[in-house]
Amino acid sequence: MSAAPRIAIDAMGGDSGPAAMVAGVAKSYRRDSTLRFLVYGDERLIRPELAKHSSVEGKVDVIHTAEAIAATEKPSQAIRRAKTTSMGMAISAVKDGLADAAVSGGNTGALMAMSKLALRTMPGI
């Protein structure tokens, strides 16, 4: 049997931030209880949201970072700060083999630029 799928989550991305991302984690877990989550972002904002969803208790690791990519931030600026941001850390988790996939509701341009730099593209793409 293969290991449980691990999903890295940028909890600070999107208009609703951690509330929407943690609710999505809980919903995903209800659909597939083999999933495990690495949630990146401001722990002070994430923990209260996790407390609302007891079903994921023990299935989520929170990795704190106070830095996030703004929706208005240019991809070139975001790349320079990637290592210390929730989005950049989630992508790095995939690169480093800690996660199988990364999810972000944040700045799409920054996500694409950081992902392409960190993960490269598949052959032929």
Label each residue range with its predicted role:
Residues M1-L117:
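Contiguous, glycine/small-aliphatic-enriched amphipathic segments in soluble metabolic enzymes
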Residues L119-I125:
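A short alpha->loop->secondary-structure connector
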